[in-house]
Curated annotation (Swiss-Prot):
Protein name: Putative nickel-responsive regulator
Keywords noted in UniProt: DNA-binding, Metal-binding, Nickel, Transcription, Transcription regulation
Gene Ontology molecular functions: DNA binding; DNA-binding transcription factor activity; nickel cation binding
Cofactors named for this entry: Ni(2+)
Highest taxon above the source species: Bacteria
Keyword Transcription regulation in annotation: yes
Extent of the signal sequence: none
PANTHER family found in the cross-reference section: NICKEL-RESPONSIVE REGULATOR
Amino acid sequence: MAKIVRFGVSIEEDLLENFDKIIEDKGYNSRSEAIRDLIRDYIIKEKWNLKKEKVAGSISLIYEHDVYGLSEKLTDIQHHYHDVIISTLHVHLDEKNCMEVILVRGKVEKIKRLYDELSSLKWVRHTNIAITDII
């Protein structure tokens, strides 16, 4: 485990009160835990913006399965990015809609291109990405 370093933060009283309420509602044991999570999230977002670091995560999308050629297009795109795709999960949500969850690991730039290609397809109703740092 990494060495813990103590440091001080100056903050407006009302901002701190709001923060304390949120961390209590979420069940954090301390402000330090919550601040560490916020810093980790910020670092991951910056890595995403810089497009240089390696990350892991998931891309989820919802689409209509009966649209001619869409399933094949999704498969073709995934084969093009086989080097960053770890695994996929396909779920039939109802008679019309499917959900695909794609687990990814690799350079941010390539994962972002995969996400953008999937998001831009017509009849893909919703896409979402969740990433984390590879420690």
